Amino acid sequence: MRTAQITRKTAETDISVEINLDGTGTYDNLTGVGFFDHMLDQLARHALMDMTVRCAGDLHIDDHHSVEDVGIALGQALTQAMGDKRGIRRYGECVLPMDDARVACALDLSGRPFLVWDVEMPTAKIGTFDTELVREFFQAFATHGGITLHLTQAAGVNSHHIAEAAFKATARALRDALEVDPRTADAIPSTKGSL
């Protein structure tokens, strides 16, 4: 089983993350940030990754530290659960429509973190959630997960739909990239011999 448990404690947040890459998409995410929990639920469900996240953060300041630090911990958990990445397909992509929004995700589990973010949300807030934190999450997740991650928005006028399409597209691309290819189950998916 490709699983991981991460705990991360700083002066700003106290986080625990458990994931199972070979799960069915069950989730139990409580960060104190309702909209963010909803996005994490989408990530787990559509990646078919079992996920439990707990975060106690300095929400009296704002949501920034909690969202970014969960991205860090989740990326670390992904790296740990993948191990040497033997047998994975490595690459994934998805173009995902959600009502007015359409977001494309292309990713490579390369070990070379990089984020290309071509997504614009028309509002500064979704409820009480700062929309700029969506990018902060993906930056932290890509950096600590060793993911080359491209997210490109082609359409959308509703910030909630755009954000959700980005999370779901990433989830679907991750699902494909993490899948073990039975033809190369014992091989590292690189001519270098390591990722």
Swiss-Prot record:
Catalysed reaction(s) here are: D-erythro-1-(imidazol-4-yl)glycerol 3-phosphate = 3-(imidazol-4-yl)-2-oxopropyl phosphate + H2O
* Keywords for this protein: Amino-acid biosynthesis, Cytoplasm, Histidine biosynthesis, Lyase
Q: Which GO terms describe its biological process?
A: L-histidine biosynthetic process
Intracellular or extracellular location(s): Cytoplasm
Enzyme Commission number: 4.2.1.19
- Cite a single GO MF annotation: imidazoleglycerol-phosphate dehydratase activity
Question: Which is a Gene Ontology cellular component entry for this protein?
Answer: cytoplasm
Read off the InterPro entries from this record. IGPD_sf, ImidazoleglycerolP_deHydtase, ImidazoleglycerP_deHydtase_CS, Ribosomal_Su5_D2-typ_SF
Of which family is this protein a member?
A: Belongs to the imidazoleglycerol-phosphate dehydratase family.
Please state what the protein is called.
Answer: Imidazoleglycerol-phosphate dehydratase
From what organism does this protein derive?
A: Jannaschia sp. (strain CCS1)
For this protein's source organism, the top of the classification is: Bacteria, Pseudomonadati, Pseudomonadota, Alphaproteobacteria, Rhodobacterales
Provide the gene name from the record: hisB
